[in-house]
């Protein structure tokens, strides 16, 4: 999924607080021409729509700086939220064109109902729900699906068990635990009943 965002260069000497009062959110684009950065402004309404569809370090964005002029692919690297108002405060983008593989965070989606949960009353324990991977910008997956249907109580899946799309490489240790099925949880009342029965 690629999303197009229109932006403008930030006027020199402009104050971030004044920009926000006028309905503009300050932003920066890094990685443009190597280490050069560009100060930007984006309309608050555009940012609001963007954040409904984009995750930090995940979604490829077509960023258009109308008065630069510059247009290219970028990732939203950082999002600052106002501590009191809970509204977007500042955005940082990273230009990915010409940088080869990039590092992104990808959500994990667990599909199916584990046998150990459905038939044996076990509990599905998801240890991680996001994973850092390396891939080319055009290969960034929106989500990585993991089928847990065949997991029984005591079974687990590690990163090495995940079928990654071609060109996507996990950056965490392959032995790292992702999901497992735990035995049914016994309540205090049930435990007391079992103790009385045993005695």
UniProtKB/Swiss-Prot annotation:
The keyword Ribonucleoprotein applies. Gene3D superfamilies: Ribosomal protein L25, beta domain, Ribosomal Protein L25, Chain P. Signal peptide: none annotated. It holds the Pfam family Ribosomal_L25p. The keyword RNA-binding applies. It comes from the Bacteria. GO terms for cellular component: cytosolic large ribosomal subunit. Transmembrane segments: none annotated. Keywords: Ribonucleoprotein, Ribosomal protein, RNA-binding, rRNA-binding. Part of the 50S ribosomal subunit; part of the 5S rRNA/L5/L18/L25 subcomplex. Contacts the 5S rRNA. Binds to the 5S rRNA independently of L5 and L18. Belongs to the bacterial ribosomal protein bL25 family. CTC subfamily. This is Large ribosomal subunit protein bL25.
């Amino acid at each position: 999924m690629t999303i197009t965002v229109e932006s403008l260069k930030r006027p020199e000497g402009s104050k971030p607080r004044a920009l926000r009062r006028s309905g503009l959110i300050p932003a920066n684009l890094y990685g443009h021409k190597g280490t050069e950065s560009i100060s930007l402004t984006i309309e608050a309404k555009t940012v609001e729509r963007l954040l409904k569809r984009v995750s930090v370090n995940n979604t490829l964005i077509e960023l258009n700086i109308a008065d630069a002029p510059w247009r290219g692919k970028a990732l939203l690297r950082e999002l600052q939220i106002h501590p009191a108002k809970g509204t977007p405060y500042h955005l940082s983008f990273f230009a990915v064109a010409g940088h080869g593989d990039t590092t992104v965070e990808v959500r994990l989606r667990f599909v199916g109902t584990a046998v150990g949960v459905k038939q044996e009353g076990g509990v599905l324990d998801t240890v991680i729900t996001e994973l850092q991977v390396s891939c080319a910008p055009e290969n960034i997956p929106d989500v990585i699906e993991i089928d847990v249907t065949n997991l029984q109580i005591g079974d687990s899946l590690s990163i090495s068990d995940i079928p990654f799309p071609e060109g996507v490489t996990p950056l965490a240790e392959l032995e790292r635990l992702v999901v497992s099925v735990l035995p049914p949880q016994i309540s205090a009342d049930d435990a007391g009943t079992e103790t009385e029965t045993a005695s």
